[in-house]
């Protein structure tokens, strides 16, 4: 397994305030890491640092040579007054052919959206188009900023299953950002809890019981947490439960 990117003792300081404080982590190929933390914890700054958009104040970042990073932002801001099709939007990503656009959309099961109006896409459709754009360059590392934001439960389930299939198809690492453990992918290899520094890390179930996580998120976590375990041989209703009566795992609640 190849180490794609390593942060060692990274700090980012704005106006004498440590937004990122002594963070060390490694991202390996074919692994999924989920970064969680409350608003203002430094998640966006850490993502910018990984993408190379934010220079660390101190510490070191090592990247695999010719590392290709695909990025899916939390939300796309478009000028509503300017008409833009999905095809036109994908053209902005670089010199790729229409066939390459179609192939990328097919990977995310959205080829039917090629000529659709970007302004009229649902939250789930927008995420798939953004994901297709990121896949055009065949990334080694896929960075997803709050991918489930604004997507309904069924859409989240489908999106996570799609991310899992992409991980295997490209043998790429996935670094995913979330504000909480709610519906964290069951296939996540590691959860990192950030509050400017790394409070704790580990499997989702172990993080939910960690004293530092509990201290950070408080008792409200009991109503918020559910770990989604995807089964491939059935359909889901809108609640995310199997709709065909098959025997499979229910969503698993996290306990204290």
From Swiss-Prot:
Binding sites annotated in the UniProt record for ATP: 37-44
Record flagged with keyword Translocase: yes
NCBIfam families named in the record: PRK09544.1 (NF007090)
Family according to the record: Belongs to the ABC transporter superfamily. Zinc importer (TC 3.A.1.15.5) family.
Name the record gives this protein: Zinc import ATP-binding protein ZnuC 1
Gene Ontology cellular-component annotations: plasma membrane
UniProt function note: Part of the ABC transporter complex ZnuABC involved in zinc import. Responsible for energy coupling to the transport system.
UniProt-annotated stretches for the region Disordered: 232-256
EC number: 7.2.2.20
Subcellular location: Cell inner membrane
Keyword annotations of the record: ATP-binding, Cell inner membrane, Cell membrane, Ion transport, Membrane, Nucleotide-binding, Translocase, Transport, Zinc, Zinc transport
Record-annotated ABC transporter domain positions: 5-220
Gene field: znuC1
Gene Ontology molecular function: any one: ATP binding
Topological type in the membrane: Peripheral membrane protein
Catalytic activity: Zn(2+)(out) + ATP(in) + H2O(in) = Zn(2+)(in) + ADP(in) + phosphate(in) + H(+)(in)
Subunit structure: The complex is composed of two ATP-binding proteins (ZnuC), two transmembrane proteins (ZnuB) and a solute-binding protein (ZnuA).
InterPro entries: AAA+_ATPase, ABC_transporter-like_ATP-bd, ABC_transporter-like_CS, Metal_Ion_Import_ABC, P-loop_NTPase
GO BP annotation list: response to zinc ion
Top-level division of the source organism's lineage: Bacteria
Organism from which the protein derives: Aliivibrio fischeri (strain ATCC 700601 / ES114)
